[in-house]
């Protein structure tokens, strides 16, 4: 049975202990190589997985680390010392261009905590915001200020949790990052079945946002809503004031907006175009970009039926002269006026009288 915290007893890419003095070539089987190359075990592809029950692999299925290193630039040697929990395996990530990822090997219960996340401790003033800080998490003080960052970008500070990728959207997210004390943990937010990649991002289930005090949780929001009829302005101002970016102190009215904004500082771009692999920090920006590939134009003008791929294009069109209806449409039911001549004043008066008579309501005696 799996405990509430994933144990740190795992081994070299496969279940079971590595015997003392066992060479790396003796534990890398064809099945492990298949997983490394294609991202899943063979049984996921409909083939039967034949595990070697002994500690020694068959010479026909064993591959030397030197041969693998030539193909993967020494990645296998790095992974040979990686300690994995028995509940997970490492394989090619399902996210394009992200390299290796962590997949569940057995069922992982909701609420299971993994960690702590390890790495170098960096003071906030020493963080280079121009770098790719995807492998970095912030740790907060009780007053909501950043205490330090945990950076796992250097190889000698990496653990198996480093290979867990960030979720691109809420639908694929199955882990959330939580702060317990001064340590960072990943927590399963749902029951995770076998052969599913572990993907993490910030969560909403706790009364604090990544341990930041003062951010209203569910219970606090429910209490606040009871008093909104009496203090609506104060309530809205207080919520926006508490949800502030810890780096630039900009205020937000929701946690999702704050999480999206934080990607500007971390340079995290989890949204990848499936056509050109270009990366974006916002899902809405990715959707607009994909329309350039697909030719989709969902925004249509109701007057002239012109179509646009982005809402900004439609709004610009609506402000232009092309969007205005023809002026003749307003004159369709107006009587034609004669050309001006010497008796124009008299004719104009007669036309006005006729028009007035035309619009007088009929009276029934």
Swiss-Prot record:
Its main location: nucleus. It comes from Mus musculus (Mouse). InterPro entries: PRDM12_PR/SET, SET_dom, SET_dom_sf, Zinc_finger, Znf_C2H2_sf, Znf_C2H2_type, Znf_PRDM12. Belongs to the class V-like SAM-binding methyltransferase superfamily. Keywords: Activator, DNA-binding, Metal-binding, Nucleus, Repeat, Repressor, Transcription, Transcription regulation, Zinc, Zinc-finger. PANTHER family: PR DOMAIN ZINC FINGER PROTEIN (PTHR16515), PR DOMAIN ZINC FINGER PROTEIN 12 (PTHR16515:SF20). This is PR domain zinc finger protein 12. Transcriptional regulator necessary for the development of nociceptive neurons, playing a key role in determining the nociceptive lineage from neural crest cell progenitors. Initiates neurogenesis and activates downstream pro-neuronal transcription factors, such as NEUROD1, BRN3A, and ISL1, specifically within nociceptive neurons, while repressing non-nociceptor cell fates. Essential for the proper function of nociceptors in adults, influencing both their excitability and their gene expression, thereby impacting how these neurons respond to various pain stimuli. Interacts with EHMT2. SUPFAM superfamilies: beta-beta-alpha zinc fingers, SET domain. Pfam families: PRDM2_PR, zf-C2H2. It is found in: Nucleus. Residues 318-338 are annotated as: Disordered. GO terms for cellular component: nucleoplasm; nucleus. A zinc finger (C2H2-type) spans 243-265, 271-293, 299-323. Residues 86-203 form the SET domain. GO terms for molecular function: DNA binding; histone chaperone activity; histone methyltransferase binding; methyltransferase activity; zinc ion binding. It comes from the Eukaryota. Residues 329-338 have a biased composition (Low complexity). One of its GO terms (biological process) is neuron projection development. Disruption phenotype: Embryonic conditional knockout (KO), results in a selective loss of the developing nociceptor population and a reduced sensitivity to certain modalities of pain and itch. Adult conditional KO results in altered neuronal excitability of dorsal root ganglia sensory neurons and dysregulation of a set of genes encoding receptors, channels, and neurotransmitters in nociceptors. Shows altered pain responses, with normal sensitivity to thermal and mechanical stimuli but diminished responsiveness to capsaicin and increased sensitivity to formalin-induced inflammatory pain.
């Amino acid at each position: 049975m799996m405990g509430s915290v994933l144990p740190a007893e795992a081994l070299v890419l496969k279940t079971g202990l590595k015997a003392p003095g066992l060479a790396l070539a003796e534990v890398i089987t064809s099945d492990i190589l298949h997983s490394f190359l294609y991202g899943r075990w063979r049984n996921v592809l409909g083939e039967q997985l034949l595990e070697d029950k002994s500690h020694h692999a068959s010479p026909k299925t064993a591959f030397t680390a030197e041969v693998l290193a030539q193909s993967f630039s020494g990645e296998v040697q790095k992974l040979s010392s990686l300690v994995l929990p028995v509940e997970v395996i490492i394989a090619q990530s399902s996210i394009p261009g992200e390299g290796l990822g962590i997949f569940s090997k057995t069922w992982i219960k909701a609420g299971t905590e993994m960690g702590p996340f390890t790495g170098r401790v960096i003071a906030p003033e020493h963080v280079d915001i121009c770098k790719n800080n995807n492998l970095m998490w912030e740790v907060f003080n009780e007053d909501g200020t950043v205490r330090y960052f945990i950076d796992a970008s250097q190889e000698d500070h990496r653990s198996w949790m480093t290979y867990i990728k960030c979720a691109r959207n809420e639908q694929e997210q199955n882990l959330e990052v939580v702060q317990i004390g001064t340590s960072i943990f990943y927590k399963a937010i749902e029951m995770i079945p076998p052969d599913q990649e572990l993907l993490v991002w910030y969560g909403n289930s706790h009364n604090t946002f990544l341990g930041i005090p003062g951010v209203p949780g569910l219970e606090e929001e429910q209490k606040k809503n009871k008093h909104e009829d009496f203090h609506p302005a104060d309530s809205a101002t207080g919520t926006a004031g508490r949800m502030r970016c810890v780096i630039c102190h900009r205020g937000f009215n929701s946690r999702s907006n704050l999480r999206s904004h934080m990607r500007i500082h971390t340079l995290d771009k989890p949204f990848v175009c499936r056509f050109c692999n270009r990366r974006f920090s916002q899902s809405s920006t990715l959707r607009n970009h994909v329309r350039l590939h697909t030719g989709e134009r969902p925004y249509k003008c109701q007057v002239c039926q012109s179509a646009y791929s982005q809402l900004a294009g439609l709004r610009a069109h609506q402000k232009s002269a092309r969007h205005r209806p023809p002026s003749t449409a307003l004159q369709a039911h107006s009587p034609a006026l004669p050309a001006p001549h010497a008796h124009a004043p008299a004719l104009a008066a007669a036309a006005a009288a006729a028009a007035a008579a035309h619009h007088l309501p009929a009276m029934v005696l």
